[in-house]
Structure formats: C-alpha cells, structure tokens
Amino acid sequence: FRNCVRNIGDTSGIDLSSVTQAMSGAEPVRLSTIEAFEKKFGVQNLITPAYGLAEATLGVAIWPRRTPLRPDPSGKFLSVGQPCRGVSVRIVDEAGPVAPGVEGEICVKSPGVMQGYYNNPEATRRVVSPDGWLRTGDLGFVDREGYLFVTGRLKDLIIVGGENIVPVDVEEIVDHIPGVRYSAAVGIDSERTGSQRLHVVAEVREGADDTEALSGLVREIVQRVHQGRGHRPARVLLVRPGTIPKTSSGKIQRSRLGQMIAGGELGDRLVYASGAHRE
C-alpha cells in the first residue's frame, strides 16, 4: 500500500470501485499508510487489518469489513479485531498473563492450533504449552473491550540502555522523511557496552549520489529518530533499492539484515554510511 502511494503519480486511470476488501497482515499495519492510500485512490474503509499465522491455521483476528478502523490511544497502532470464533487470545510476560493495555507476547489457543512441528518435539515444546497455548513470538496487547493490537515481533526488539525499542516505531519516523523509499531498524550487539546499538538502514532512490545531500539525509534521520524516540542511531546506512531483505510475504527479515551489517555483506549496495561515501 505504501509503495502504491509513493510510486503511482497519476491516479486518473485507476478505478478501484470493484474492489470490496484488501487485507493487510504481513506486518503491523500503520494508520498513516492506510489513510494516505485511501485518500490518494478515493476509497474508504477498504483495507482490513488482520492477524494470523500458519501454526494457528492462519486466521486469529480479522477486522470486520467496511467498518471504521480502531486505533489505540497513541494513534500508532490499529486493532486487527477481536479473536475469531473459537479462538482465545491472551497476552503474557515472563510472570504470566498481563492486564488489558499492557504489551506482551501474544498467545493463542483454538482447535486450529497445530499439534506440533513435524519430527521436532523440542521446537514444539518451546512454543506449545501442555494445555494447548501457542506462543506466537509476536508482541501486542488487548484493550478492555477485547480488541487485539499487534505491535511487532519479540525477537526484533532492540534493547538500548535497558529500554525496549520496537523497530516499527523507528521505521514509522524514517519512512516519512523525504528521500527515503523504505527503512528498517535493527539492533546490533556491542561487545564494548554489552548492550545493543541502534542501526537504521534506509533505501534511497536509484541514482542518489550527491554526497552533500546524502550526508544531510543521514543527519535528518538521526535528528528525527532522536526527537521521536529519545535515542540517536549509532549508525545510519543508506542503501540501494531492494537491499533490505524480506520474506515472500513481505516481512522484513531483520535478523538477516543484522547479519548483513555485522558481516560487512552490504558491499556495493551501500551508498552512504555514517559520513563515509561508498562509490
């Protein structure tokens, strides 16, 4: 949806009147993206946030079609709806279930939850409890009315100075900066500090090679992230389009991206990094 907003200029020949529903569920859906898409293409209540995973036979919660969306009080996250019929959801932390509105790991129980991973009982024990609750590895919260909000992936959390940073919060800031096509935030372990360091990778348009302009873009990214999140990125890496790895369903592969950064694998995909220009 975001690519449509950014890359389609003339919409006069586009007619979406026959489209009744468009579901979004690969990543936590952003209110700003939906609003921009619907405004640009002249549609309303078309995009439906949803949540599911293969281990739960896909559908866990699906927002009702043609129903106004439900943002959380901060306006950052959209509800994916109440659990589907026959599905139970609870949010837990290390101590157990948490109160409404508190973020934690999403756990699911339903007849559709898998019995286990094929020929892998150890992996099964890690994610499925003896009483049938599936640990999804996803972060979220449930409000007092029972609506589920998905905020990110537990394994993607960036811990800087003892504070948890959700990558999508950083990416939401960076993606709105002119000159950035797409971005990803990852945490890279630091042997010196024993903590993680925030790295921002931003794809810029093909042909962007003005050193002064790229340096200015890096400074703006650092400034805006610091203003919005209270942390300065340790490094900002500007890369060519298509560099950020994704799954077949469009999810950012942050662990793979972290490996690419730590292993120096960006190579000629790197355009500019923390003040160092790469031809």
Regions inferred by a protein language model and the residue ranges of each:
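Conserved ANL (AMP-binding/adenylate-forming) active-site segment centered on the GW(Y/F)…HTG consensus within
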Residues: 72-77, 113-137, 154-155, 171
